[in-house]
Amino acid sequence: MVDPVPEEEKAGAELGDSGGDEAVASVPPDAQGAQEPAASSASASAAVPCKAEVPCAAAEGGRREQSPLLHLDLFNFDCPEAEGSRYVLTSPRSLEACARCAVKPVELLPRALADLVREAPGRSMRVATGLYEAYEAERRAKLQQCRAERERIMREEKRRLFTPLSPAAAAAAAAAAAASAPSAGSSSSCSSASLPASPAPRAARKASPSPSSARTQPPPAGSRTGRKSHSLDSLSRRREGALSSESGASSSSYSGESLRELRWPPRALARNSCPAGSASSTTNAPGRPSALTLVPITGRSFSLGDLSHSPQTAQHVERIVRQVRAERGLRGVPERDRKIAALMLARHQEELLLLEQRAAAHGQWELQRVHAEQRREREEREKQRALEQGRRAWAAQVEERRGRRGREEREAARRRQRQYERSEERRRELAERQGLLRRERAERAAREDRLRKLQQEQNLKQREEGLQEGRERAEQIRRERAQRAARAKQRQEGQLQREKRELSRAERARHEALLQGRTRQQRQEREGLRSSLEASLGRAQENYEHLVEQRTRELRERARREELQGRRAKEAAERKEREHQAHLEALARAGERRLQHATQVAEEAVQQKARRVGQSRLEKERAQRANKEKVERDEDCRRRELLQAIGRKLECTQHLSRERRSALESARSTARASFHVREKVREETNTRSFDRMVREAQLHASLDRK
């Protein structure tokens, strides 16, 4: 049988060790070590027709009609169309074992777990694994059963080799040969009249001994592809050596009539029987063998050498030679032409035998196909039921996990929102307390300043009353100095206020930037995975707490510094007040010289302070320019590095795209060349592809169902 199995799916192995007439054609190297049978041949039982189909109906002159349904041909690997085929030729022993066990060969093929998952995408892995284990256990049990049945078939063949034929069977075979010899006028008449009226019983053949039984001894059953069973070969050689004294010139041959006497009924019964593949072929006709009676034929193979060297074939060839010599006036026919004629006659006889065997096999396989379809429907219903249960359980689990995850996410979001609100509330309270403290300190300082000024004015008024002119002059000088000091103090206070405002603005800008960055980070993390959001929020919360603690420490430090500055200003003011009182007393005693000296000292101090302020401003501007230049240089360096990296990446991308295009063009050219080569070979061989055969089989099956 020819299995239309692609080379990549061949398993190249049988149910057991190869023996007798197993034949494997063109099995790829990666499948030679397989232990499983080449059971993919069952795909031809209900899926596709065989590739090399023997034109059997032509041999009968159109008298036998082919079956309209798909059928299985067990003996189509002898035709010339099957030679050179890429597909597996399975063993008749393996097929017979499958037929006896009511197992389709495709059921012995191993299937991957991915195939079961792909058949039903909704099934869970647990259900798929259970189905896979059940299928694998059932497959191994069927495989073991078929192997045991095949071993039993081989043992029956060995027993037949050692069992001598009875004299009654030998006499019946000789009588049938003598009766068929006169009626064989041509190759067609010989082949049609060589079948007996009824099959000879095996018990009668075993009962009576006869010297002619050696002529009916079969030759070694050799494989058609050159692979022979060494055990059967050695047994047949020993058998042939033991009977060589009685066999004569044709000791290792069968006649066509003796082969037909082995099991099969007359051709009239086979010709009048129902076509293979029809519904009526499921029942056995009175003269047709069932699947269990196919053992003698499907268990062994008869080569052309057995048929071409039989005495009947030799007599037929001699008669044809005499007729040709008489009609054409030729002197003689070469031995090579005689052998060719004998081979042609033997081939015709074997085709008739194979036709009878095929007719019986078609009926049995059609019955097996119907049973297999019913079993497959039951298995499919059970599989769909298990699949639906697994799908419902899986959907319930998924819904439960989805609800639990949603609740956890909502709870985490509410918890994060509460933490954020609490942190914002703490920050606002801290800012309010700090503002209140700053206002209180400013009011206290202003109140103390007013009290100090009032006290100074009262003291000055009392001293003015006692000191008159000098005091008035001193008061005038003091007021001028006080005005200058007030202006200087106002400038200092304005400077301090501006610095405080700048610091507050910078702090507020930094805080806003942090808040904006925080908001942007939260938005980006919310768009990402929720798991990474929790980790990022934790880190951001820690950073925010660190920032709040740092800002609190800075505010405390600034408050401490302001308080220290206030104390220092107060001490400086008190010190200045004491110095001023001493200076006023010295001025009152010393006069104009001391007053001029004080004026010069004050002017020098103001000038020095102005110079220091100008120098500090110049240094700050210089530092700012240096920082700006450094930042610009860093930006230029980063920009150049980025441009260089982009250029290198573009070059690499272009290089990869060129390589990809060249590889794609090379692959396309190779594919086009392969396609044209295959098309040329297909045109020359005029063979059908596997896909086309599958489509034709599906089309014929659909038309037959309609």
Curated annotation (Swiss-Prot):
Entry annotated with the keyword Transmembrane: no
Stretches assigned to coiled coil: 362-604
Keyword Lipid biosynthesis: no
Alphabetical keyword list: Coiled coil, Phosphoprotein
Biased amino acid composition, Low complexity: 38-47, 183-214, 242-257, 664-674
Modified residues (Phosphoserine): S310
Record-linked Pfam families: DUF4659 (PF15558)
Basic and acidic residues bias spans: 374-391, 453-483, 490-513, 542-580, 617-634, 676-689
Region (Disordered): 1-47, 183-292, 374-393, 398-425, 453-580, 607-634, 656-689
PANTHER family, A to Z: COILED-COIL DOMAIN-CONTAINING PROTEIN 177
Name of this chain's protein: Coiled-coil domain-containing protein 177
